[in-house]
Regions:
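Alpha-helical "hinge/linker" immediately C-terminal to small N-terminal DNA-binding modules
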Residues: 1-15
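Solvent-exposed beta-strand sheet faces enriched in polar/charged residues
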Residues: 12, 27, 54-58, 187, ...
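Central regulatory/effector-binding core of bacterial HTH transcription factors
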Residues: 21-81, 232-235
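Acidic, Gly/Pro-rich loop/turn segments at junctions of secondary structure
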Residues: 47, 56-150
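C-terminal effector-binding regulatory domain of bacterial HTH transcription factors
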Residues: 50, 172-181, 191-235
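Hydrophobic hinge/microswitch elements
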Residues: 141-186, 192-193, 208, 216
Length: 235
């Protein structure tokens, strides 16, 4: 029996039927990586235990895919000269602040009230770009004059947790849980900041491996099933 147990323990682990092996190098903005991608990748690896993934998180978009990258996820409408672009959809945004900040500075009742508040944005609002808010067929533009300028949406939301202001580009996909836990308060819930378009980028001239194609399909399916994300049905 002891020898039989030894043979069982030393036998090679069989790969689950239909699973994928190999390695994938993927790059994504910090907010998408932490809020969405890491849980999805770990779920994908549980299905495919012999798959290795190298994930690099960055601040802001990329205009050129690095040669060592198999998949890049970009948000925003930025051109990328060496990529095949597959649209995923859009990330819905919301505005949030802490109870402490709102108690001290007041709760905005209209978009115009935001001009008297400290507004915390991401990389797409640091160079003088205004905040665009949508409600049905209405569109309002709010200028931003922030004392604290942050190039990352997650950092802006963290600053809001510490009473620094109103995070105006927080992604709904991972912020609603903080609202449900009463750590943040949804500001002007009838108004929604312009959504952020998101795409999968694949290098031109390189045939994607079966592992890359499978992970892209998995990400697209996860995107489709998340009610806080808008899926592009043309994918």
């Amino acid at each position: 029996p002891l020898l039989e147990r030894f043979h069982k323990l030393s036998a090679p682990v069989s790969r689950p039927e239909g699973s994928i092996s190999g390695s994938i190098r993927i790059s994504a903005p910090n907010a998408i990586g932490n809020g969405l991608l890491i849980p999805w990748i770990t779920a994908f690896q549980r299905r495919n235990p012999e798959l290795f993934v190298n994930l690099t998180l960055t601040l802001g978009p990329m205009h050129i895919i690095p040669p060592e990258c198999d998949i890049r996820i970009n948000h925003g409408l930025y051109p990328c000269s060496n990529a095949v672009i597959r649209k995923l959809g859009e990330m819905r945004r919301m505005m949030v602040a802490s109870a402490g900040y709102l108690a001290k500075h007041g709760v905005p009742k209209t978009p115009e009230d935001l001009e008297f508040h400290e507004l915390l944005g991401g990389n797409d609002l640091v160079n003088g770009a205004p905040l665009v808010l949508l409600k049905d067929n209405e569109r309002v533009i709010v200028p931003i004059h922030s004392k604290l300028r942050l190039k990352d949406h997650t950092a802006a939301r963290t600053a809001a947790l510490f009473d620094a202001g109103i995070s105006v580009h927080a992604f709904r996909s991972d912020t609603m849980e903080l609202v449900r836990r009463k750590l943040l308060i949804h500001v002007l819930p009838d108004w929604e900041p312009e959504p952020s378009p998101v795409s999968l980028l694949l290098p031109i001239g390189r045939k994607p491996s079966s592992a890359v194609e499978a992970l892209c399909d998995f990400i697209a399916e996860k995107w489709r099933s998340n009610p806080e994300l808008v899926f592009d049905h043309g994918l």
